[in-house]
Amino acid sequence: MIAKLKGLLDETGTDWAVIDVSGVGYLVHCSSKSLAALGEVGEACTVYTDLQVSENDMRLLGFAEASERDWFRLLTQVQGVGSKVALAILSALSTEEVQTACANGDAAMVARAQGVGPKLAGRIVNELKDKAGALPSAPGGAAMAANPAGGASADAVSALENLGFKPAIAARAVATAQGELGEGASESELIRVALKRAAG
């Protein structure tokens, strides 16, 4: 199963993006929030993915953060919530807002999403209320502890090497990016800035 893609943002549409990984273009369907977070066409990006397989279709769903993918998987466990509805919810609400709505039983907040009526919204918050505290709402905290700056830097160097940059150039560009962004910089931020420095 494809869990994550690292490459260049090749093309975008209203609810999808094409990620070029070593010359292979992967079509991923995304929420509007994830699409906005991926950056500009031609820039390096990282997409967390979930493969949905049905009798007549196979599609890759893409997320800018692992926490959004986790919430997508939780939402699609609720009866009546398919990938389209789950993406609509994650387009209308941040993961933090989804978590708050479920924890507080706030069906009205979930019903703000396109295609989600009061009955379905009520079912979502009722079924996910007990699970709301089990997932991180946004990157940071535990996620940062699990992926310290050193790990992010190493992954960023690897990503640049995969894009064709020599190891020395990739390492120098990432080190420069780290200096500019600070120790708390995420992998995607490091890749974005380092790519500009390496190409410059």
From Swiss-Prot:
Q: Which GO terms describe its cellular component?
A: cytoplasm; Holliday junction helicase complex; Holliday junction resolvase complex
| SMART domains, sorted | HhH1
Query: Region entry Flexible linker: which residue ranges?
Result: 144-154
**Which parts of the sequence are annotated with region: Domain III?**
154-200
Q: Reply yes or no: does the keyword Flavoprotein apply.
A: no
**Spans annotated as Domain I:** 1-64
GO-annotated molecular function: ATP binding; four-way junction DNA binding; four-way junction helicase activity
Q: Does the keyword Cytoplasm apply?
A: yes
Q: Where in the cell is it found?
A: Cytoplasm
| Coiled coil location | none
Chain positions covered by the region annotation Domain II: 65-143
* Functional note: The RuvA-RuvB-RuvC complex processes Holliday junction (HJ) DNA during genetic recombination and DNA repair, while the RuvA-RuvB complex plays an important role in the rescue of blocked DNA replication forks via replication fork reversal (RFR). RuvA specifically binds to HJ cruciform DNA, conferring on it an open structure. The RuvB hexamer acts as an ATP-dependent pump, pulling dsDNA into and through the RuvAB complex. HJ branch migration allows RuvC to scan DNA until it finds its consensus sequence, where it cleaves and resolves the cruciform DNA.
What is stated about domains? Has three domains with a flexible linker between the domains II and III and assumes an 'L' shape. Domain III is highly mobile and contacts RuvB.
Q: Per its UniProt record, what HAMAP family does this chain match?
A: DNA_HJ_migration_RuvA
Belongs to which family? Belongs to the RuvA family.
Query: What is this protein's record name?
Result: Holliday junction branch migration complex subunit RuvA
